[in-house]
């Protein structure tokens, strides 16, 4: 299905947010996700199903020092 991910259209296989983060190869504990304008708690990812045309912003947290 096609989603808008960080402002760019992208074809993905994932059916929910948790699977999408895994498909993208991001560490599950180090990502923040906004789905159609709503920030999601980590516990909501497996329950948040994706649909054609959904808009997501995924931010990878990186610590520095």
Could you describe each region identified by the protein language model?
Residues 1-64:
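Ubiquitin-like/PB1-type beta-grasp interaction modules and other compact soluble beta-rich domains
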